[in-house]
Regions:
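A positional/architectural concept
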Residues: 7, 11-65
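A conserved beta-turn-beta hairpin within the catalytic core of GNAT-like acetyltransferases
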Residues: 68-69
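Glycine-rich hexapeptide-repeat left-handed beta-helix
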Residues: 1-11, 45, 53, 59-60, ...
Length: 172
């Protein structure tokens, strides 16, 4: 479902895919090739949410922001059951299944991985190429070139899947 809030309708690129079982509301921009999957919620009611190109928000995830807004980069994989309340997520990041990124001036730089189940606390600044694990999240290493290639393949897969779903019609 795509709805306006306070008279502001989400702006969704024609090449993006939004499942009819997702909820996208308010001041939201979704870039080309991006996909929002069933059960996911993208709320631009407190602040603007910008989702870049070729980014996927997988099933049952929430993307929201406070009044500062949120910018999610290009080629980002937001896994299943993720709560993303972060202010800035860089390009080529993976927010793995079940992780939580709390808002309040939180920034994750390019090429980062937030591991499954990890919790990034508010006001955290995660430097580029970091691998974050645990509760609270701590940097446990650097993302390798091999991992970046694998993550890009995963992002590309979701671009293709989104296009197939658009072509084949609605999810039933």
């Amino acid at each position: 479902m795509i709805k306006p809030f306070r008279g502001i309708m989400p702006k969704i690129h024609p090449d993006a895919f939004v499942s009819e079982f997702a909820y996208v509301v308010g001041d939201v921009e979704i870039g080309a090739g991006s996909s929002i999957w069933p059960g996911s919620v993208v709320r631009g009611d407190a602040g603007k949410v910008i989702i870049g190109k070729n980014t996927c928000v997988q099933d049952n995830s929430v993307v929201h922001s406070d009044d500062l807004g949120a910018v999610i980069g290009d080629n980002v994989v937001i896994g299943h059951r993720v709560v993303c309340h972060g202010d800035k997520i860089g390009n080529n990041c993976v927010l793995a299944n079940g992780c939580i990124v709390n808002g309040g001036r939180t920034e994750i730089a390019d090429n980062c991985v937030i591991a499954a189940g990890a919790v990034v606390l508010e006001k955290t600044k995660v430097p580029a190429n970091s691998f974050v694990v645990g509760v609270p999240g701590v940097i446990k290493g650097q993302v390798t070139e091999e991992q970046l290639v694998r993550f890009k393949r995963n992002a590309d897969l979701y671009v293709r899947l989104g296009q197939e779903y658009k072509k084949d019609g609605k999810l039933e």
